[in-house]
Amino acid sequence: MTQLYTYIRLLGACLFIISHVQGQNLDSMLHGTGMKSDLDQKKPENGVTLAPEDTLPFLKCYCSGHCPDDAINNTCITNGHCFAIIEEDDQGETTLTSGCMKYEGSDFQCKDSPKAQLRRTIECCRTNLCNQYLQPTLPPVVIGPFFDGSIRWLVVLISMAVCIVAMIIFSSCFCYKHYCKSISSRGRYNRDLEQDEAFIPVGESLKDLIDQSQSSGSGSGLPLLVQRTIAKQIQMVRQVGKGRYGEVWMGKWRGEKVAVKVFFTTEEASWFRETEIYQTVLMRHENILGFIAADIKGTGSWTQLYLITDYHENGSLYDFLKCATLDTRALLKLAYSAACGLCHLHTEIYGTQGKPAIAHRDLKSKNILIKKNGSCCIADLGLAVKFNSDTNEVDIPLNTRVGTKRYMAPEVLDESLNKNHFQPYIMADIYSFGLIIWEMARRCITGGIVEEYQLPYYNMVPSDPSYEDMREVVCVKRLRPIVSNRWNSDECLRAVLKLMSECWAHNPASRLTALRIKKTLAKMVESQDVKI
């Protein structure tokens, strides 16, 4: 029974030592020396069983660097072990120290394994002053897992750097090769212009090409490859106009004069919309500006948006009226041809090759051109709206541009126009057309009298009116351009006055349609025996 009790005591002591030694480092074990005042073994009292550590004899050990405060002549006393330890510090210098190690945990600490961060070796013995003769040596250098990881990362970083450098070299070679190729192709362009004529045979005129595309093509204009070829071959001659969208140049293609509208890059939406409208199926009409080609030209540092159309040397109706007067026949010819163009725009043509209805949205005298035969054609379709009755959708361009305020209808100025329906856009065009007829009528001579050219509302608003200016005059006061008394004394001008008044009515529903205007003017043309 006594032996069983002793074994239980020993097992408890071992568990206690293990639980404490695991949380302690070597230094804490070495500083506790188990110093005693004498070397005698403890005597057991009657009926008392001693622990194993209390029965062990005490040793005298040599101490250096680990001496307790009460050490005498570099000696210390312990019931554990004497030790000697050699350590290497962060600077690589070695230090040899000695001392006493207390009994508890000494067996574990004497088997201390070297750490990767700190190289050291400890040796122990159990006889008096035995550690004076111990000569521990440092363990060999071992590459730990941390150092292994550093090498692996270094290898990875070097590999990545090599790959990046290789990619940069490869990309540079590719870009240089591409640049050289583009330079050579650009050089070949000037030499190979003649080869482009394979698409356009020698002797073919623009009229021939357009007639062929109308009869054998889809009716939406020239093939894109032909358009691009024409755009490349055009020679710019001189600038003939400039506006908020860009510039207009007179150019030449194989000796034929053409108009080249060069859009600012900020007006790409206008260029795209106008090109789209012009290439609508069955869009071509004698009173709509003749579209030839569209292209984007650039070298990387700059971009030009080209729209190539027929060239009309008489310029716009605005320019023409400022320097020319009209007789009644010329007036009717201008008005009727403009009405025909507007009627074609507004009319939807049904069928598999049909045409949607189109509203202009920026009708004014500057956007109507004068042809050689004295008739008109409508231009500048960058703000146009399309409508297809099959889908019942109003196709409004994504464009920040707005129409000209002076020509805006009342419902546009007061923002009451229903943008979800197409008919209001048609009626707004009719209002603008009424103002254009007024501009023409002022320049018509009757009885030797004619007024000087003026813009609508010239005496009511500033030269560059604001929305508020126009809204006050047109919507609030409901004023319209002044009419000369002489108009009532002439049969033709009296009929024209009635027509324009029905065009600029305040209520959109009261305005005439483009077809009605066309038919009314046709009767007047017939009565005046005007040759169209």
Curated annotation (Swiss-Prot):
Annotated binding of ATP, by residue: 240-248, 261
Any single biological process term in GO: paraxial mesoderm development
Enzyme Commission (EC) number: 2.7.11.30
Cofactor(s) needed for function: Mg(2+); Mn(2+)
Entry-linked PROSITE patterns: GS, PROTEIN_KINASE_ATP, PROTEIN_KINASE_DOM, PROTEIN_KINASE_ST
Disulfide bond annotation, renumbered to this chain: 61-82, 63-67, 76-100, 110-124, 125-130
Domain of life: Eukaryota
Active-site residue numbers: 362 (proton acceptor)
This protein's UniProt keywords: ATP-binding, Cell membrane, Disulfide bond, Glycoprotein, Kinase, Magnesium, Manganese, Membrane, Metal-binding, Nucleotide-binding, Receptor, Serine/threonine-protein kinase, Signal, Transferase, Transmembrane, Transmembrane helix
Signal peptide per UniProt: 1-23
Enzyme class: transferase
Residue span(s) of domain GS: 204-233
Chief subcellular location: membrane
Tissue: Widely expressed.
Function: On ligand binding, forms a receptor complex consisting of two type II and two type I transmembrane serine/threonine kinases. Type II receptors phosphorylate and activate type I receptors which autophosphorylate, then bind and activate SMAD transcriptional regulators. Receptor for BMP2, BMP4, GDF5 and GDF6. Positively regulates chondrocyte differentiation through GDF5 interaction. Mediates induction of adipogenesis by GDF6. May promote the expression of HAMP, potentially via its interaction with BMP2.
Protein name (database record): Bone morphogenetic protein receptor type-1A
Biological source species: Mus musculus (Mouse)
Taxonomic placement: Eukaryota, Metazoa, Chordata, Craniata, Vertebrata
